[in-house]
Structure formats: C-alpha cells, structure tokens
Amino acid sequence: MYGIEYTTFLIYLISIILLNYILKSITRMMDYIIYKFLLIVTITSIVVNAQNYGINLPITGSMDTSYVNATKDEPFLTSTLCLYYPTEARTEINDNEWTSTLSQLFLTKGWPTGSVYFKEYDDIATFSVDPQLYCDYNIVLMRYNSSLKLDMSELANLILNEWLSNPMDITLYYYQQTDEANKWIAMGQSCTIKVCPLNTQTLGIGCQTTNTGTFEEVATAEKLVITDVVDGVNHKLDVTTATCTIRNCKKLGPRENVAVIQVGGADILDITSDPTTNPQTERMMRINWKKWWQVFYTIVDYVNQIVQAMSKRSRSLNSAAFYYRV
C-alpha cells in the first residue's frame, strides 16, 4: 500500500520537475526568438530611415511649371542665391551700399544675410565666354538689346539647360549630329565657324573639302555659338581654334536651378520653340522697368515665387570645365 503511494508520489514529482524543465526551455526559446526579432526590427528600421548615399536617385517630374509661393521660409535658410547683373546696373544706382540694402530687403523675404550673392558681369558677350553658376539658385538679369537678341537667346539656351560635352578634333575627323539634342557649342574671344557637308563618298556637297573658302559660314567673330546642322550628315569644320574652343554637346534636359529675367524690350526672348526644349515652359521672365532700383525691388518682391519654379537639385555650370555635366 505504502509502496504504491510512494511510487505514485514519485511519478507526480518527476512529472512536475519535467514539466517545469519543459516550460523553462520553452520560455528561454521564446525569449531568444523575441529578442532576435526585436533586434532585426531595430536594425531594419535604422537602415530604412537612413539616407542612402550610395545611389544617385534620378530627378523625376518637371520643376518648370508655376507653383504657388510657399509660406514656409525654412528651405531658404540653408540655400544660396546668386543674382547676376550687368555693370550698367551698378553704374546707374551709384551707391556703395546698394547691395547691403538689398540684402536687408531679402532678409524680409526669408533669405538670411550672407545667403544672397551679387555677381557683376560686363556685358552679354563677356558673360557668354565665362558663365559660372555655383549657387543653389541662380537668377541672371539681362538688359534687352535689339542688336544682341540672338546672343541673348543663345546664352539663355546654354545656361537654362544641362549639356554633356566632348572635345572635337576637327583637323583629323569629320563630325555629324545624331539628333536635335546634339549641337556643337563654341566659346571664345572670337569664334568663326564654317562647315562643309559631305556625301557618302566624303566629297563636299556644294563645297570643296580642300578649300575652306568654299565652306558655308554659320558664325562670324562671335563669343558664343550653338551650331545646328543637318542630322546624320558628316561635316568637315573650319574653326578659328586660336581664339575659340568647340565641343560636341548633347542637351540632357533643363538646368532647373537657373532662371533668366529679361529687363525691358518690346520683344520677348523665347527659346521654347526649340524642339529639344522639353517641357516647353522655361524659367524665363520679363520685367519692364527703366530704372535698376525698380528692377531689384521687383526681384526682391517675387524672389520666392521665382524660386518655387526652380529646383536646387541641378549641377553647377563652370566654363573652366567647358560646361561638362559634373
């Protein structure tokens, strides 16, 4: 009798001990699984929230449409604005403190002191040779001149778009333009460009390849030339290389951190008819004021609206690198 009770008690005791062991094992296993899961979740959340600097994400969509001015000024606290103006503006204003005055006025629009830079250039022709657009946002003021309107249009086409350019060795090779986005861009103190189209036997069409005097002249003594010829046809070129550099360039798209403001003029500069301009709305505007103070006051008033039609996520333009996309 006592032996049976003792055996039963022993079985219960062993069962309890075994059950306790199993429960502890399950608890330890669950703790391990839970801790591991939490660790994975923590690491994953950190990776997901972090910015991936190893991938160059493409800029999608267009920033060329008009946007309603934002009420927030915070984005401008870390941005820089360059304002390019001709020498005649400073000469007319004739005030040594005029840039300081404008800086204080820009401050009222949310642009901190020191974030706006004033860049002076002599004239359109000189600026065409050495355009350097380094700021997050760049606004170029161009006084309209009927005798320079073609130069102004070419300059606007250059700085409002990104170009991928390669050197051209015109002494050794013939060149052809593959499509409408392919142009030859020349810069220098004096660029005279002549072309001779060739047939499939590399003989001149209406010209002699050995006589540059028979070539068609497409530019004469200009500082900036964007040359467009018939696509898919080889050409032999003659360029004043001593005073001019020419490159084979491809238009990649809009340079969205640049805007051009035409000052005055009965005609409005328009480069949107170029079939390679996509979208057809460019960051080009016109201000009709006779006095430069009025021009700058208007710029200050509408600077945020102008910037909202731009994007700081564009590459800088430096003619020292001959407007490569860098």
Curated annotation (Swiss-Prot):
Q: Which GO terms describe its cellular component?
A: host cell endoplasmic reticulum lumen; T=13 icosahedral viral capsid; viral outer capsid
Additional comment: Some rotavirus strains are neuraminidase-sensitive and require sialic acid to attach to the cell surface. Some rotavirus strains are integrin-dependent. Some rotavirus strains depend on ganglioside for their entry into the host cell. Hsp70 also seems to be involved in the entry of some strains.
UniProt similarity note: Belongs to the rotavirus VP7 family.
In this chain, Ca(2+) 2 is annotated as bound at 177, 228-229, 231, 301
Q: Which residues bind Ca(2+) 1?
A: 95, 206, 214, 216
Q: What does UniProt say on post-translational modification here? A: N-glycosylated.
Q: Identify a single GO molecular function assigned to this protein.
A: metal ion binding
Subunit structure, as described in the record = Homotrimer; disulfide-linked. 2 Ca(2+) ions bound at each subunit interface in the trimer hold the trimer together. Interacts with the intermediate capsid protein VP6. Interacts with the outer capsid protein VP5*.
Give the span(s) annotated as GPR motif: 253-255
Q: Which cysteines are joined by disulfide bonds?
A: 82-135, 191-244, 196-207
Subcellular localization is given as: Virion; Host endoplasmic reticulum lumen
Q: Which organism is it from?
A: Rotavirus A (isolate RVA/Cow/United States/B223/1983/G10P8[11])
Q: Where is this region: LVD motif?
A: 237-239
Keywords for the protein's UniProt record, in alphabetical order: Calcium, Capsid protein, Disulfide bond, Glycoprotein, Host endoplasmic reticulum, Host-virus interaction, Metal-binding, Outer capsid protein, Signal, T=13 icosahedral capsid protein, Virion
At the top level of its lineage, which domain of life is listed?
Answer: Viruses
| Protein known as | Outer capsid glycoprotein VP7
Give the signal peptide range.
1-50
